[in-house]
Every structure is written in structure tokens, then in C-alpha cells.
Amino acid sequence: MRYLKRITIYISLLILVSGCGNSKEAEIKQNFNKTLSMYPIKNLENFYDKEGYRDEEFDKKDKGTWIVHSEMTIEPKGKSMETRGMVLYINRNTRTTKGYYFINEITDDSNGRPKDDEKRYPVKMEHNKIIPTKPIPNDKLKKEIENFKFFVQYANFKDINDYKNGDISYNPNVPSYSAKYQLNNNDYNVKQLRKRYDIPTKQAPKLLLKGDGDLKGSSVGSKNLEFTFVENKEENIFFTDAVQFTPSENDES
């Protein structure tokens, strides 16, 4: 199911301008570095004072809302796919943050079609601490939620310029861009993911960086990262992370 979904994504990427050359890769790296050089942002409340990329959808009086999202998905051979993660909506107008922790299991129904079973646990953030706003069914899950850390809080991309031979795509009309690199298990961020998650493979991941916003602009657009350890019809292991800046009226949780 994951495999087929990714095929659709790859087909859509074919509309992008590929093979941009070394100069475009350097330009894209430089743009990503405007955001990634700030990692780690250990205190998420710093987002209250951080400006983002604003398009025509923004009201002039709206300071915007940051959405941070981290999740790990594991589908072992012969078993269902499970995703655990958290989403926070950091509202710069009200300087309040709410969101939810979620556990999503994807199984096949009697007709072989994928079926989602997602459970959400609402949370808020105060003083950089995650606090469940409703009773949690067990202490283990409660601790898992309270101790959750977003990738943006511990990642470090100081060596991004050392990433070489990336697959580069750029669409100036959106504008959007992406870069894909093969990493090794000695990479700092790979080590951090293995430290925090029980990743059942020794295979090193590929890193896909996706972003939008003006490459030459000074403001920060949306940034999406995906570490794919295993991807095939029988088994999938991947970690995804997103930092997005949106109009506050689109704040949903």
C-alpha cells in the first residue's frame, strides 16, 4: 500500500524540472540551510517570534501559525503498518500551542483494501512541555506522549554542504524544490533517529528534502524531510518530518 502510494508521488514529481545542475543544487542547499542551520530548535516556543514565508493567502494582520509534525512509520514483513507521531499548531497571534499525538494502524479489509485505524490524543504545549489535555488510557502511553521530541528539536544539519550527488528537482512556478541523498549510518541525524526509535534494519536511509517558497527570498517557507530506510511491497520503514507556515485560519487540530 505504501509502495503504490509512493509511485503516485513520484509520477507527480515528473512535472518538475529535473537535472538542474550543480549550480541549482548549491542554490537549493543554500535555501534549505536558511532553515536547517537553525536546528536544533530545542525550545519550540521560539517559533512564536519566527517569521515565515507569506503568500497572497495571508491576511496582513495575521502573524501566521507554524505547524510542526514528526512521525515514524514501520511496516515489518507480514505485519500491518503502524505510524506514531505528533502534530503541533503554534499560533503566533495568540502565542498558544495545541495539537495531538496519534497512533495510526493500516490494515487490509476483507476486500484487500487499506483501512486506517487512527487514535488521537489531544495535547497542548506550555513552557516547552507537552501536556495531554484528556485522560490517557495507560501510564506508558502517557509518558511516551509527554517525552515526545520533534525532529526539529534534536536534528543538526551543519554538514549539509557535504551531501553530494543529489537528485535535484525545481519548479519555479509553485515555487518548490527537492533534493535526495543517500546517507550512511554514521550520519549524525541517522544516529539520532536510531537512538530514539527501534528501527528494525541496519540499512542506511535515503534523505529527501522538500521545500517551497522563493529560493532567493529571505523568509522561511515550508520544509519537509523524509528518511527512507526500507521501501518495497512487503516492508516499509521511514521517518517523516515537516515544518510548515500557514495562515492562522487554517489552524486545525
From Swiss-Prot:
Keywords: Cell membrane, Lipoprotein, Membrane, Palmitate, Signal. Pfam families: DUF576. It is a lipid-anchor. The keyword Manganese does not apply. Residues 1-19 form the signal peptide. The keyword Cell inner membrane does not apply. A lipid is attached at residue 20 (S-diacylglycerol cysteine). GO terms for cellular component: plasma membrane. InterPro entries: Csa, Csa_sf. It is found in: Cell membrane. A lipid is attached at residue 20 (N-palmitoyl cysteine). Gene3D superfamilies: 2.50.20.40. It comes from the Bacteria. Belongs to the staphylococcal tandem lipoprotein family. This is Uncharacterized lipoprotein SE_0145.
